[in-house]
Amino acid sequence: MSQKEQTLMTPYLQFNRHQWAALRDSVPMTLTEEEITRLKGINEDLSLEEVAEIYLPLSRLLNFYISSNLRRQAVLEQFLGTNGQRIPYIISIAGSVAVGKSTTARVLQALLSRWPEHRHVELITTDGFLHPNSVLKERGLMKKKGFPQSYDMHRLVKFVSDLKSGVPQATAPVYSHLIYDVIPNGDKTVAQPDILILEGLNVLQSGMDYPHDPHHVFVSDFVDFSIYVDAPEELLKSWYINRFLKFREGAFTDPDSYFHNYAKLSKEEAVDIATSLWNEINLMNLKENILPTRERASLIMTKSANHSVNQVRLRK
């Protein structure tokens, strides 16, 4: 089969960086360099150029989709003769540990909330829906943190389902990376946002992952648009190790940090531990649970060095 025939058969439209950047059209830049600095992750070089060439075209596309969804809701209300409840448009962001999902989520939240409609955009990470450490220890799952079985999936699905059902408000637990645990009584209330951005490792999982349980309900069943942030395995590993080293010099120095003992490690020891954590936990989770869901995404952003996106694939 020729490369041209393979391209025609793919469910995705493929864009290089230059082609994607051209789709920004005339969307104005609404973020300053100072704001971008606050939005980026500890390990990322997020530039004004990256926001302009990658995230502004994406926010334009999402705005079209969201506006179309609102029109569809209005048609349904007109047909039923009702004043409908506010149903949020849900965007999910998946990808490996250290790929930059959180930065993507924060940038999109900032951009989408600054469209002329001034939409209310909430951001929730699925980390909060991890079982507390006490439960994970009891079940022998501390080394499986981030794997599907480490989450309270019932509560996560109920949270998303409630919002899609138009309930006035729903609560989401909050996770602290400092204490490496869910914050007791630290729930966040989400009250009928226009847009919900849900960021997490496994938000693209579906019934295809559980063929033995056809009645299982998944977060992906309630998502309107899904994004997978992708990068080559070797880059992910280096980003994870570099992030660990930065935490060793920063967050781990806090006496309250769960990983405070790591602050005393030499650089060589820290690299060895980070490499082991990557190989034994995060790489395994990526290969077994995260990467197999990539082709279900509405859009795949592929990163190269310095967290710069060099390819975008959009589902037809």
From Swiss-Prot:
Family assignment from sequence similarity: Belongs to the prokaryotic pantothenate kinase family.
GO MF, one annotated term: ATP binding
InterPro entries on file: P-loop_NTPase, PanK, PRK/URK
Major subcellular site: cytoplasm
Gene transcribed to yield this protein: coaA
Keywords on record: ATP-binding, Coenzyme A biosynthesis, Cytoplasm, Kinase, Nucleotide-binding, Transferase
SUPFAM superfamilies: P-loop containing nucleoside triphosphate hydrolases (SSF52540)
Pathway in which the depicted protein is active: Cofactor biosynthesis; coenzyme A biosynthesis; CoA from (R)-pantothenate: step 1/5
Full protein name: Pantothenate kinase
Catalytic activity of the protein: (R)-pantothenate + ATP = (R)-4'-phosphopantothenate + ADP + H(+)
Cellular location(s): Cytoplasm
Lineage: Bacteria, Pseudomonadati, Pseudomonadota, Gammaproteobacteria, Enterobacterales
PANTHER family: URIDINE KINASE
EC number: 2.7.1.33
Binding-site residues, ATP: 95-102
Highest rank taxon of the organism: Bacteria
Keyword set includes ATP-binding: yes
Pfam families reported for this sequence: PRK
KW Transferase (keyword) present: yes
Residues that span the membrane, as ranges: none
GO biological process: coenzyme A biosynthetic process
Any one of the GO CC terms: cytoplasm
EC class (word): transferase
